[in-house]
């Protein structure tokens, strides 16, 4: 390791060297930095940063064999497909079920990991992964698809929003509690991104998105668009379109593929 870091410095002269390695290796990097100090390379020692992460437990079978990634994904697909078929609200063709199930399986694995502190250890499980009203990947995907559906049902109003060069001047948002909470949360997206980058903690963004999805659910229930006066409907749709934009970009940022239909 000592020879390797010296060689890297010779080749790249980087500003820093970041090692994303299991937290059990913390002592290893402490010793590496000490060795560099001993050979009077404190400058290089200061460049080394160990970013530890916790281990995922519960991936061993009853026979003691660690499950392969494709086995975990396949198991998630089976559970997701069963959930989709039993759901009374999800309306997709049979031909779409397998692709949707694969998406939900992958989304669950990603969110299950990234919603926790990077350094924490946890037991992996699909328990509650496909339960409604939980802080899980299903929540993100369902709320995104619902916002897409809302935009499609109000296509003419969406065209007006797209054509309006300066909608914030022409429209006034209602200042009700649901609107205030959702707007305030949307305003905090940049802060969540910066904090996640600064602390190297993906959970900052993931938790933000789960909170956003919950706020969207509450807002949709109380801020109707269909059947409302034109200006009110337009302002509400603008709010939901902004929420979908942030939700979509945030989901893609953590590695999810947002579903447009569920």
Placement of each model-derived feature along the sequence:
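Non-catalytic interaction-recognition regions
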Residues: 1-262
């Amino acid at each position: 390791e000592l020879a390797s870091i010296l060689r890297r410095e010779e080749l790249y002269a980087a500003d820093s060297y970041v090692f994303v390695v299991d937290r059990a290796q913390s002592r290893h990097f402490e010793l590496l930095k000490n060795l560099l100090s001993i050979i009077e390379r404190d400058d290089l020692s200061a460049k080394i940063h160990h970013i530890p992460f916790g281990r995922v437990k519960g991936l061993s079978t009853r026979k003691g064999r660690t499950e392969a990634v494709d086995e975990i994904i396949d198991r998630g697909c089976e559970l997701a497909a069963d959930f989709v078929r039993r759901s009374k609200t999800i309306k997709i063709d049979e031909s779409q079920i397998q692709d949707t199930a694969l998406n939900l399986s992958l989304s669950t694995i990603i969110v299950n990991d990234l919603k926790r502190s990077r350094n924490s250890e946890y037991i992996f499980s699909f328990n509650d992964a496909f339960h409604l009203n939980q802080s899980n990947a299903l929540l993100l995907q369902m709320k995104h698809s619902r916002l897409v559906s809302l935009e499609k049902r109000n296509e003419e109003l969406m065209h007006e929003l797209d054509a309006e060069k300066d909608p914030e001047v022409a429209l006034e948002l209602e200042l009700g509690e649901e609107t205030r909470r959702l707007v305030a949360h949307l305003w905090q997206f940049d802060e969540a991104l910066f904090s996640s980058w600064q602390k190297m903690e993906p959970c900052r963004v993931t938790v933000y998105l789960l909170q956003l999805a919950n706020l969207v659910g509450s807002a949709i229930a109380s801020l109707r668009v269909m059947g409302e006066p034109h200006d009110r409907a337009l302002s509400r749709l603008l709010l939901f379109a902004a929420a979908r934009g942030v939700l979509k970009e945030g989901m893609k940022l953590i590695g999810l593929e947002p579903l447009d239909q569920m």
